[in-house]
Amino acid sequence: MQTALLKPKIIAVEPLGDHHAKVVMEPFERGYGHTLGNALRRVLLSSMVGYAPTEVTIAGVVHEYSTIDGVQEDVVNLLLNLKGVVFKLHNRDEVTVSLRKEGEGVVTAADIELPHDVEIINPGHVIANLSAGGKLDLQLKVEQGRGYVPGNVRKFGDESSKVIGRIVLDASFAPVRRVSYAVESARVEQRTDLDKLVMNIETNGVISPEEAIRQSARILVDQLSVFAALEGTESAAEAAAARAPQIDPILLRPVDDLELTVRSANCLKAENIYYIGDLIQRTENELLKTPNLGRKSLNEIKEVLASRGLTLGMKLENWPPAGLEK
C-alpha cells in the first residue's frame, strides 16, 4: 500500500495578458488543492514586497484639499493618479524623484525624472492635464514595503511627516493585484481522486506571476520550517541559558580555596563574601572599609588573585548564578 504523498509540480504557465497568467499545478492528494491554494492566495495578496509612493510635496500646495492654477485635476485626484504609478527600485529601499512640467498638455509617468536604478512600469499612466500657463512641480518619495500601510499610521510614527506642505499617502505596496484559484479533478494512472490546482494571478509588473508564485512558496516554507524542527527546539529557559555568558568555574569556588590568612578570611566572611566571584567584584576602597582588614591583608588578597589572573573591581554579568548557596 502506498503511503507517500504525491508531490505536485507546475505543469503549465499560460499567459493571459500583460503581467497576467494562469498557473496549473498537479497532482495533489485530495484536499491539498484547497489547503495550498488558499495559503498561497493569502500570502500573494498580503506578504509580497513591492514599491509605492508614500509622500509628496507639491509647490504651492499646503494640504490635499487645495487646487492648483492651470491644473485640471484637484489635489485629491492628483494624489490618486500619483499612487497609480508603478515603480521598481533596483538595489535600494527608497528614492525621491521629481516631476516638473509646464505648458498645456498631458503629464504622464514618463515625465518623472528618475535615477538610473529606478524604473517605471507604466510610463503612459496619466498624472494630470495642464492648461495654457499651467505648471506642476512636485517631489515624490517612493519606498519599499509590504502590504497596505494607511497614511495616518505613518503620520503618527514619522516626525518628517509633520513638515508643512508634505502630504503623506496611503501606500499599497502589494505587487499582486488579483489572485483566484480553482480546484479541479486530476488523475494519475488508476487514481481519480486527486486535485488539480489552477491559479489565476495578475501583478502590476514589478514581478511576473511565475516569480510571485515562487516567492510566496518560499515565504510559506520559511514560516513552516520552525514546525519541522519542533522536536529539537530548545525551551525558552534552555535558550536563555545558552545565550547567557558562561561563568568561569574558578569564580564559583569558596574564598577558603585562596588559602588566605585566618584574619583575612574571617574579615571577608563577615562581609558576606563567600565565593571568589563575590570577592573580585569588590573594589580596594570597599575592602579597606571592612573592619579589621588593613592594607597588609588587602595586599595579600590582591597577590593571591593576581596569581590566578584575577583582580579586584571586576564586573560580572548574571551574578550570583541561580542555585549558588551562601
Curated annotation (Swiss-Prot):
Record Pfam families: RNA_pol_A_bac, RNA_pol_A_CTD, RNA_pol_L
Family matches, as InterPro entries: DNA-dir_RNA_pol_insert (IPR011262), DNA-dir_RNA_pol_RpoA/D/Rpb3 (IPR011263), DNA-dir_RpoA (IPR011773), RBP11-like (IPR036603), RNAP_asu_C (IPR011260), RNApol_insert_sf (IPR036643)
GO MF annotation: an example: DNA binding
Known EC number: 2.7.7.6
CDD domains in alphabetical order: RNAP_alpha_NTD
Subunit structure: Homodimer. The RNAP catalytic core consists of 2 alpha, 1 beta, 1 beta' and 1 omega subunit. When a sigma factor is associated with the core the holoenzyme is formed, which can initiate transcription.
Name this protein carries in UniProt: DNA-directed RNA polymerase subunit alpha
Species in which this protein is naturally found: Ralstonia pickettii (strain 12J)
